[in-house]
Structures are given as C-alpha cells and as structure tokens.
Amino acid sequence: MPIQILPPQLANQIAAGEVVERPASVVKELVENSLDAGATRIDIDIERGGAKLIRIRDNGCGISKDDLALALARHATSKISSLEDLEAILSMGFRGEALASISSVSRLILTSRTAEQSEAWQAYAEGRDMAVTIKPAAHPVGSTLEVLDLFYNTPARRKFMRTEKTEFGHIDEVVRRIALARFDVAINLNHNGKLIRQYRAAPDPAQHERRLASICGPAFLQHALAIAWQHGDLNIHGWVADPAASHTLSEMQYCYVNNRMMRDRLINHAIRQAYQDRLNDAQQPAYVLYLDIDPHQVDVNVHPAKHEVRFHQARLVHDFIYQAVTAVLQQTNAPILNISEEGEVDAPRWQQENRVAAGTNKYAQPEAAKSSAAEQAVARERSSARERAAPAYKEDHPYQKQQGELYRQLLQPSAAAKPATSPAAIPASSVSSPSIPVQRITQAEEPLHGDNYSFGRVLTVFPPCYALIEYQGGVALLSLAVAERWLKQAQLSPPEEGLRPQPLLIPLKITLDKNEIAACQNHEKLLITMGIELSVEQGRATLRAVSLPLRQQNLQKLIPELLGYLSQHEEISPDTLATWLARHLGSEHEVWNVSQAIQLLTEVERLCPQLVQSPPAGLLQPIDIKAALATLTHE
C-alpha cells in the first residue's frame, strides 16, 4: 500500500483512541473545558454509565456563534496561540483535540451562549461524517455539551466497555478528583436521574475541610496533618495522613500540579520515601497534595491524557516534596487541619487576554502587578510556622540562574536572610591556605562585575582540564581542576547552622569496620554539620542524605574513606574536613569544554572572589606573549 494522508474522520478516530479511553475520559475532558471557561457551577448528568448520555452544563463564559463550528474542529483552541503559551500552560486543555475526537465516536450536541449574545446557538456533529449543523436555541449564558451513544460507530471499542456500575464508578472517581482540585466550583453529579454527588462551592479556605470530608471521608479528616511548605518558586500544601491510619486510607492518594490532577511516578516516589520508615511494604500513604510550580519549568504535554508531567528540575522537585512531607511527619505535635483563616484570594490584577477564564500565570505578570518587598514580608510573618518563604520569581532573571540560587539556598538555608555584601566590602587580601575556608558571598548578592573580580574571557580549552583565558591585558593558562577544587571547598565550608542535607532518592547501605563505626559515632555532630545523615545499626550504616555538593559523587566509595580519615583524628574542624573532601571529590568532567569552563569560572568568581585577585599556586600560569611575539618578529 502506498503512503497516503489519512482522511480527517479516520485521523480523529485514531486520536479518540488516546483521548477517549472510556466514558470517564469524556467527562474529564468536558469538565476541564468548563473550568477553563471560568465556570463556578457544573452539572453532570449520566445515563447508563455514560454509554447512552453524558451531559455537562456550566455557567462559564460560553462560545460565540462564530466560534461554535470551529470548536468541533481538530487542533482548534482558545487556550494557546504561540509556542510561548505552550511552554507556560495553566489551562486544563490546550491541544484542541478533545471535542473533535469525542464527536468522531458519538453524536455530539454543543449549545452555548455568551454574555454579549441575545440568543444561544446549537451545533450538532455526528460520527464519521462530522458535518456541523448550527441552529438557534434557548440557553442561559454558559455551555451545555451532550454526548449521546458513545462508541456507537466503533463496535470494537464499545465491546470493551465494562458494566454500567463499573463505568460510573470511574466517572465518580474523576469527579471526586476534580472537586478536590477546585474548591471554589460547585459540582453536581446525577446518574439515571438520581443525584449522586453534590459538592457545594467552598471559596473560603476555612470551608475546605467540609468538601475534604465529603470526598475523602471523616476518617481521613480525623487523621489529616496540614502541610504548607514553600521554597523559591516551589510551593506545596494540602494534607497527609498520620501513618498510624494508613491501613484504612490506602486508596486516598490525590496529587495535583498547578491544580491539574496527576499520577506522577516522581511525586509518588518522593512521598513514599518520606513514609518509608513509618509504613511496611504492604501499606500505602494517604494524602491530598497540591504542588505549585512555575509553569515554564514543567512540561504537561508528555501524556495523551495529561496524567503525567516532566519536570525540568526533577531532582529538586523530588527532594523538595520529600523534605516537606518528612518535616510534617516528624512533628509529633503537628496540628490537624490547620487551615489558613484568610478569606478568598483577591482577583488577579493582570491577566493575558486569552487566560482570563483559564487562570492566572503569576510567573509572567508585569513587575508593577507584583507585591512589594514589604507586602511579601508581611505575608511571610502571617504564614504558618512550617512555611518556608523565599524570594519571589523575577522575570528579568534567567531561570537557570534562579535555579542555581535556589540550590545554593537549599545548601545554605540562612544565606538568603543575610544582608547583601557589596563588592567594595570584600577584602582583597591574599588567599589563605587550603585549610582556611574561602570566603563565601551571600546568595542575595548580584554577580560581581569588573576586572577586579573576573578572570577574563575564556578563549579555548586544552584537554583535559586547562583553559586559555584573557588575564590582566595578556593571556594565561588556568587549571580547571584546581578551580573546581577551590569551588567545592567553598561550597562545603558550612555556615554556623550547618549545610542542609539533601535526601537521597534511595538510602544507601554501607558495610563498615569497627574503626569506621567508632568514627561515625564519635563525629556524629560534625557529620550532621556537613549535611551528612548516617545511622549505624549492627555493623551496617544507612546513608539517607548528603549535602548538595556530594550528591553526584560515588558515595559507596567516598563515605568509607571519609570515616577512615575521621578515625585518625579525635578532633577536627568542619573547615579542615571541607578541605579534605574537596581534595578527594571526583571531578564532574573528565574532559572540559568551553561552556563548562565558563560556567565553572562564573561560580568561582561569585563564591571565591579572592582567587581572582590573588590566585593560589597551581591555579593560574601567565603566558609571556611578548616573548613569543618577539620571536616571531625576529627582535
């Protein structure tokens, strides 16, 4: 058979195989469209488990007559209009496939009216033909979608549908998940003419527990621990269940990313790791959690049904969730359902025109619309004692720089609270010996500018680890390995409160000898200061967390060597240990390239400015370019 372009009807039915798995999939897509339209009330009518009728009625903004036929066309949407919109999705839908796919396997009736129209209009499309017929109708402002005889023209798909009770059970679960995502929307679910679920709107956070109890049951409400945790652009809130009640609540697992319901493996793994010492293998944690993240840093376009996402900083998100859940579970006196008493969230002060109904992208607002520093300070004071505040996302800073600052704040949690140090206040004295810590710049400080605090431009790299740079009007060779070692030493020199431990994805089991076990016990406080969480039981050690600079190292080899070094010293300072670690860490690059060299020198200039003014031995070797020129000119 020669290659040919598929007819539109066949292409839509193929797409329907991904989008429309069962009646519950139709309900999910249509209800999400209603939410994107700004609806505050949604009525759902189901007959025969969705096989005969699915009707969704809302009071959203509606669809104009001119757009009605286009709404049923494939790849037609009001949610996005450019690649920039796709990379910062906040609306539930964006592909423009759902209505076209549904109409290709059913008889679909769409009735809608906008506030500007004096009358409503109705569009009808059926099966393979998909010709859209439009006629006047009576309808209030909003939309009603009726899907009749689902899969009537695809017998194979209809044959795989389960019993009426089973299919409605899946619909009920979808509605429950959506109701947990949008407390501000009233949702009614009817089956065969009977009211099955009625979720009243609860815009006030103080009323959220009412809906939580109606969906998850009083048992979950009784054992729920409130969680509210923030760091930089990451925010997580919701409830986790007391591990003691997990055996009765194993089915209660609801997770949302930017209010989009998810079944993401990374999130589930982080939560499971937080519960690992409190549950046996047969038990499952119970939770209702909401993760808010800059939409630029999460890709929702990776799953046909949008059940999974891909995070650009997956490790950071995993560790953030792990720490948040662990902190709540470790608080023995954690208050139950400590819901904020503040009222409704104020209406957004700015929105893009195509996002009015879909929601606010707080990460792309103009500077004038953002809270002042004073307002943010007041908000932090009012927040829960468990909430961790961090500087707001700034659009004029590249995100990778923001992410680097965020990692450094995780590494040194108090740095962001310290006053910034001006470049003029940085001492220009010669660099101390490696046993003395390199002075660290606070995270609030801007990058240093000018020749006094810059090595110069990287011209090229000589493998494996030497960079040719412009230096003080000439050129010089710089050892990237030595620069990396000094940077590691600066990162490992702990502040007064110690380095922040970063949980490992999987705890590491290490076999130790008697001397290493003794060293672990004698230097327990020092290890904690260095961000290393190591517990010893019956001759075996379990490594649960290390500081950020150690995350990429071969810990199975490094930790025994570290304990062997500690066993030779009764007293040792954190700075001395940081120096030892810096000399024993493996390099992140066997062979360097120009971009890696530039990134390294940028970090060194930021954290170790003294190395620029007084390079230590072995770091920099100026090249006598004048002598070479003289040779070439025969002078």
From Swiss-Prot:
Biased composition (Basic and acidic residues): 378-399
Region (Disordered): 359-399
General function of this protein: This protein is involved in the repair of mismatches in DNA. It is required for dam-dependent methyl-directed DNA mismatch repair. May act as a 'molecular matchmaker', a protein that promotes the formation of a stable complex between two or more DNA-binding proteins in an ATP-dependent manner without itself being part of a final effector complex.
The protein's name: DNA mismatch repair protein MutL
Compositionally biased spans, kind Low complexity: 364-377
GO biological process, one term: mismatch repair
Family, per entry: Belongs to the DNA mismatch repair MutL/HexB family.
Taxonomy, superkingdom: Bacteria
UniProt KW keywords: DNA damage, DNA repair
Alphabetized SUPFAM superfamilies for the sequence: ATPase domain of HSP90 chaperone/DNA topoisomerase II/histidine kinase (SSF55874), DNA mismatch repair protein MutL (SSF118116), Ribosomal protein S5 domain 2-like (SSF54211)
Listed NCBIfam families: mutl, PRK00095.1-1
GO molecular function, one term: ATP-dependent DNA damage sensor activity
Matches recorded under HAMAP family: DNA_mis_repair
Cellular component aspect of the GO annotation: mismatch repair complex
